[in-house]
């Protein structure tokens, strides 16, 4: 009953946001580097924040420093969706938020170099998640797979967080997918959505890694990770400015050049990541070897795909 109520409230909150976005003209206009062709409401992913907030309010204010951190990144990302903000301003908010999350993790009790590594990894993951949000369904669908995996791990492998937190966030992702995981999306996640859900997943995976002392759990993000890193390397080889928008991710080639429906491409990413997670859980004793093998296999697939189809790319 609790989750049904949460679903209904989040659904109503999303509908209310649509009215606000429509009235305030918070929209995404297509351009030559977009993978969509129609004007669409932007920022629907703000519902992820409300999902986390709902858990915070109903759990006796659990994880207050994390919620404050999520509020910071949600705020600056939402502002960026409305009007472009300066890079230094975004970095200030993001680094402040990560410091709060690290404090919630208890990371400051470890050696300083762990904090440096965590800062680099977290910054990379947040940016990668943001870059990968380019077609209908991919952010919501991929996040749903990871959250489902985390829920299973939390129940069957090791308890690293209160289960209600994961399930409440899942409710928010389901609401978003209802409006986005379709041929003609009602809304896009926006930076507020892609950065927000990335931050939530980082918090959960970080707790899992710290609780187990096993970094190989990062395999939960392997599909996004390989696509993002190899695309950056590819663009550097092409002497491009990696800070500028582009359409060179593997999923973008599939959707734009090969004309594969967005929902189909998103489903492929979901299925591949789900298979990887199932395999990892089955062979958990060989975690790091499995992670290395997964990265190598995904990299080979990426390279072969690009060798065959990148010639079709126009921008």
Regions found by a protein language model. Give the residues of each.
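"…together with the soluble PPM/PP2C metallo-phosphatase catalytic core" -> "…together
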Residues: 1-229
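Cytosolic, membrane-interface loops and tails of multi-pass inner-membrane proteins
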Residues: 15-41, 232-263
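Membrane-interface capping segments at transmembrane-helix boundaries
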Residues: 19-24, 183, 236, 303-315
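Aromatic-anchored segments of alpha-helical transmembrane domains
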Residues: 75, 175, 274-279, 299-302
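Alpha-helical transmembrane segments and their immediate juxtamembrane interface regions
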Residues: 76, 87-97, 290-315
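Membrane-interface starts of transmembrane alpha-helices
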Residues: 86-89, 190, 222, 260-268, ...
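Hydrophobic membrane-spanning alpha-helices of multi-pass integral membrane proteins
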Residues: 169, 261-278
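Extracellular/periplasmic helix-loop-helix junctions in multi-pass membrane proteins
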Residues: 278-295
